[in-house]
Amino acid sequence: MATSEGFMEFIVEQAEGAGHISTKRMFGAYCLYCDEKPVAFIGENSVFVKPTEKGRAFIGDVTEGELFPGSKLWFIIEERFEERDWFSELIRLTAGELPQPKPRKPRAGKKKYLMN
């Protein structure tokens, strides 16, 4: 599910009105975060948005597909991401329905063993 960095940057610009937008590379694609909530994946010149009730109502005629074989179905946005106001509203609505991320536990340091 490779995608170019330029396409990812374009999608980030399109979503900027939704809140604090960031990305993280994973699974050969980019995960799109809005206010620290994972709302979409960017890959293969498409955007896969996490399904929510408000998102479904906003989109209307939804196209769904697997992010990867065997995954849950996601909303596939193939062209409407070019409409900045529409796309940022979809991302904002999606993030609004998702729970706050759980705080990450600090990583435990390596144990040191003393040899006698």
Language model features: what each stretch is:
Residues 1-116:
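Charge-dense, helix-prone N-terminal extensions
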